[in-house]
């Protein structure tokens, strides 16, 4: 947050993208864990084994493509008795998770905001349930790639390093999409550790005030 709200300096230019991508990844991982607790419990148990190796890639480890974004191409039809259930993605942004969890929750959130006449939710209120997750995917994908260039340090020429506007816009986009997802998640009845709706709204507004 300091890299966004404070004056731009060399430290922000060097580490801002790294911190923002870490936030994006960890926030999405937390949402995966709250929606699919077995996935997190499996990872925790797997990593607790004595054979776990830090320097070796793990096929079952948490992955951006697989846990957040679906690995496979979308199915032509979501609901078909011929689908192999083992191949139905449970990724955070998968079409099935969107249809079963995110879209009903988004409609619940809109109804709550309308009933309570709450302000400060204009961005969410202008969206539609059917496009909420597709919009989040559309922001998270390019954002992840942009921030990754700062993490892996693709900038070998000073002229292409992120300037203040580019970096701060990326950080702001990251905080915005994460806060929107987090707020809607509290309207998913099966989501672990959901806040009371009033508290979720209060926390959302307080968080948004820190960077708007």
Task: Label every model-predicted segment.
Residues 9-12, 16, 136, 160-163, ...:
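Residue-level recognition of alpha-helical structural elements
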Residues 28-36, 145-159, 179-190:
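Charged/polar positions within long, soluble alpha-helices
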């Amino acid at each position: 947050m300091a890299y966004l709200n404070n004056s731009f300096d060399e430290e922000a230019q060097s580490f801002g993208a790294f911190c923002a991508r870490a936030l994006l990844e960890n926030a999405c991982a937390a949402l995966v864990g709250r929606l699919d607790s077995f996935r997190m419990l499996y990872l925790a148990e797997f990593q607790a084994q004595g054979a776990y190796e830090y320097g070796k890639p793990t096929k079952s480890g948490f992955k951006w493509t697989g846990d957040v974004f679906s690995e496979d191409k979308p199915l032509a039809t979501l609901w078909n008795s011929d689908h192999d259930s083992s191949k139905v993605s449970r990724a955070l942004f998968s079409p099935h998770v969107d249809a079963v969890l995110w879209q009903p929750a988004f409609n619940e959130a809109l109804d709550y905001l309308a009933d309570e006449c709450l302000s400060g939710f204009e961005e969410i209120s202008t969206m539609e349930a059917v496009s909420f997750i597709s919009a989040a995917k559309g922001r998270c994908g390019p954002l992840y790639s942009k921030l990754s260039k700062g993490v892996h340090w693709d900038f070998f020429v000073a002229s292409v390093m992120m300037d203040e506007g580019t970096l701060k816009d990326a950080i702001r986009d990251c905080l915005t999409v994460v806060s929107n997802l987090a707020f809607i998640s509290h309207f998913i009845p099966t989501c672990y550790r959901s806040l009371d709706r009033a508290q979720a709204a209060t926390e959302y507004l307080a968080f948004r005030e820190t960077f708007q």
